[in-house]
Regions:
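Helix-loop boundary and gating motifs at the non-cytosolic
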Residues: 1-53, 224-260, 267-271, 340
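Cytoplasmic membrane-interface "Motif A"-like loop-to-helix N-cap segments
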Residues: 64-79, 291-303
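C-terminal ends and interior cores of transmembrane alpha-helices
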Residues: 78-97, 304-319
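Multi-pass alpha-helical transporter architecture, strongest
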Residues: 9, 58, 86-92, 182-195, ...
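Juxtamembrane intracellular "pre-TM" segments in multi-pass secondary transporters
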Residues: 1-4, 194-229, 255-260
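A membrane-interface helix-boundary motif in multi-pass transporters
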Residues: 160-181, 381-406
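Cytoplasmic helix-loop-helix junction between adjacent transmembrane helices
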Residues: 108-146
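Central cavity-lining transmembrane alpha-helices of secondary-active solute carriers
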Residues: 42-64, 270-286
Length: 425
């Protein structure tokens, strides 16, 4: 198989992977608010974090030990897609009578099987690139860019396309149909990807930890790896905050006569998509920054970028202050990529091959699992206090609190983490 061909196949995989997520991740909050679930938005995003505590690690172990990673990717996407379609169908058929319990249950099943696919897709890509004789640090970021392209295109699709009722998909259940269909396409496509062989069975008797792949947790014995994972969790608390509330926040300006006709207030998803455009460009900077500055400085840049991400949201509006929203979207690319992508590459470079899928799952557990769960729970408390339960809602106060949190995490990381040397083969 030619190097050009494998790159194209991995591009398609990444495109579909993130297109399925982009169809609803930033706009789901708007739909939930429209059906009366506004105060529970945090729970949906916390659930993403909760299932990421165990599902990525579990599926990573399965991929390392028993089932090739590309088949695990297919299985998970298939279940996720069917459950997401069921959630959309339930919302459509229930209309104004939609109940929280059934919809939340279907969403939970879908996200429980979707979240592991992010780390598994990375493992599939790294394995294929290494087989082709390529350096993942250099070759993966340009491929991963197309995942963000897919995310952007589905964001724009649900923003501009309207249903038979004349309402944009971003405000209705139609966004879940879009996501489910794309997941099923990837379910089929993943079966055509290069084989990722499981770890050969070791001779002799294995311990339970070795047999199940839990030995990835031995990384916590390394002080610097332990610090890295702890701060991955702390920074992971920031990841889903804007995904959960940015669309709802910007759309809320329509209730203010001064901004009711502002383009941004009426096209929140399109405005937010500038964040993903920035992400696309920033991915290309990662190889240079990782080689030049190392993981510590790259993650520090990400942490302080989150400060500006939240701060600009707090100060902006869709009218004369829309430029602050644009700046927030620009720094998002740095905030997200310099943490998520660089962290994943760091784990890949500094772990043994036999536990890499498990280690990627562990990274997901700390960031999108524990971090996102705690972060979205805390963010929900803040937003409910200052917005939904307040006599005079103050979104700005909530955003400034999030910015202050990111600043404190960045300062502590600068003090406690030392950039380790790259693992020698």
């Amino acid at each position: 198989m030619s190097n050009k061909n494998i790159s194209l196949r991995l591009i398609i995989m990444n495109f579909l992977e993130f297109a399925a997520w982009g169809a609803y991740l930033t706009s789901m909050g708007s739909f939930l608010a429209s059906v009366g679930f506004g105060p529970k938005i945090w729970l949906f995003f916390a659930t993403q974090g909760f299932v990421s505590i165990f599902m990525p690690a579990l599926m990573g172990i399965v991929a390392d030990k028993w089932i090739p990673a590309q088949k695990v990717l297919s299985l998970c996407q298939g279940i996720a897609g069917l459950a997401m379609l069921a959630a959309g169908w339930y919302a459509m058929s229930s209309g104004a009578g939609i109940q929280f319990g059934p919809f939340y249950a279907l969403y939970t099943i879908s996200i429980a099987f979707f979240m592991p696919t992010i780390a598994i897709a990375n493992s599939v890509a790294y394995n294929a690139l290494e087989k082709a004789g390529k350096d993942p640090v250099k070759a993966f970021p340009p491929i991963r860019v197309f995942g963000t392209v897919g995310f952007i295109l589905t964001m724009l699709f649900v923003n501009f396309v309207k249903g038979a009722d004349g309402i944009q998909f971003q405000h209705t259940y139609n966004q879940f149909f879009v996501s489910g269909i794309i997941s099923l396409i990837l379910c089929i496509y993943a079966l055509t990807l290069p084989d990722c062989p499981c770890k050969p069975k070791a001779e002799g008797t294995q311990s339970f930890v070795e047999a199940t792949g839990l030995n990835a947790f031995r990384l916590f014995k390394d002080r610097q790896f332990a610090v890295f994972f702890i701060f991955s969790m702390l920074l992971g608390a920031s990841l889903q905050v804007t995904n959960g509330y940015a669309n709802t926040f910007i759309t809320s300006f329509k209730e203010n006569p001064a901004f009711s006709n502002a383009w941004g207030a009426n096209n929140a998803n399109a405005l937010i998509s500038l964040s993903q455009v920035s992400e696309t460009l920033c991915i290309l900077l990662i190889p240079f920054f990782m080689k030049k500055f190392g993981i510590k400085k790259v993650m520090l840049i990400a942490m302080f970028a989150w400060v500006f991400r939240f701060g600009f949201f707090g100060a902006g509006n869709p009218g004369g202050g829309v430029w602050l929203f644009v700046l927030s979207c620009i720094v998002y690319g740095v905030a997200f990529d310099f943490f998520n992508i660089s962290g994943s590459l760091f784990v890949n470079e500094n772990t043994d091959k036999d536990i890499r899928s498990s280690a990627q799952g562990l990274f997901m557990l700390m960031t999108n699992g524990l971090g996102a769960s705690i972060g979205t729970w805390a963010a929900g408390r803040v937003v409910n206090h200052f917005v939904y339960n307040a006599a005079e809602p103050s979104w700005s106060t909530a955003w400034y609190i999030f910015a202050a949190y990111a600043f404190v995490v960045g300062v502590l990381f600068a003090i406690l983490f030392k950039d380790p040397q790259k693992k020698q083969s």
